[in-house]
Amino acid sequence: MFQDRSPRANTALRRALAAEGGRFAKEARDALGLSGEPALHPDLRVDPAARLDASSDEPLSEDDAEALNDFRDRVLDAYGAELSWLASLPTVVETERFLFVHGGLPHEDLASLSGTNAFALMKNDRFIDQRLHFSRWIVAGHWPVSLYRPEIPCAAPYIAASQRIIGIDGGCGVKLDGQLNALILPDASEDRFEFRMADALPERTALDRQEGSRDSVSIRWGDHYADILRREDGCAYVRHVSTGRTLWIPESFIFRDGSPAQIEDATDYALPVEPGDRVRLVASTPRGAVVKKNGVTGWYYGRLQ
């Protein structure tokens, strides 16, 4: 998933996907020199007349098109073998009790999905929120699991037991507190799961006890608009547009000013912490630190070492 953090990043992504309207087709695969199914690679050989999207009047300049085509050629020269290998992989991995897919599945009848556009299985937004139920466990990524949690931000795997779906996307690369999740199946014949997680955040030791807060809000991508009420000591006091909740956030979490502003995932949740707990530091401010403990992100107002 791509998080729209800046106009430059968003424009670059749209331009990269401009050809063929962002569709993944056989012509796109052939243009990249790849073989095999599924056709999962966009054609980056762009036409200067291509539009950024259906609602935009901004055309690609000749310089932009030339730069993108040069980038495409360099990527293919450097990683052609890797891209061919990726294109040869199955879209769905099937076992007796599990189905593994990047985005999601409409149902378990894989035979009936033969010949469909694999992109729909790769980009399946809000898969768990679709309230589908399966007999086998579906393990999916793509949609960061913190987006399923409206009160407390947590990047640990999300197990929707009644639906038999496990979301494992920890937001690595698109969330400031993102992490890489590894799901472990100790016994594939049992409904028993473990996981390990890793991130690149610095580790600190908490020195003071802190009780967890009981009422909190988690501002997430897609619902990330806030009015900035004031700024103070590297923080901003904001009002979340959709809920009306007010909270302090690190000022650096504002990635686009405006009325309203757009902010990174944020929360007013205070983590329960004991002295000696190891936490991961997301952001430090004079008001406190945003840290992560066991995959859960929140504020810590004690001392860190």
Sequence positions of predicted segments:
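A structural signal for short hydrophobic beta-strand segments in well-ordered beta-sheet cores
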Residues: 92-93, 183, 228
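SH3/SH3-like beta-barrel superfamily modules
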Residues: 221-250, 274-305
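SH3/SH3-like (including bacterial SH3b) beta-barrel domains
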Residues: 209-221, 257-285
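Short acidic-glycine loop/turn motifs at beta-strand connectors
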Residues: 95-97, 161, 184-189, 242
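Acidic, His/Gly-enriched loop-helix segments that form or flank divalent-metal centers
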Residues: 36, 62-166, 172-176, 193-199, ...
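Short, basic/aromatic beta-hairpin or loop at an interaction surface
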Residues: 196-207, 243-260
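Active-site neighborhood of divalent metal-dependent phosphoester bond hydrolases
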Residues: 1-91
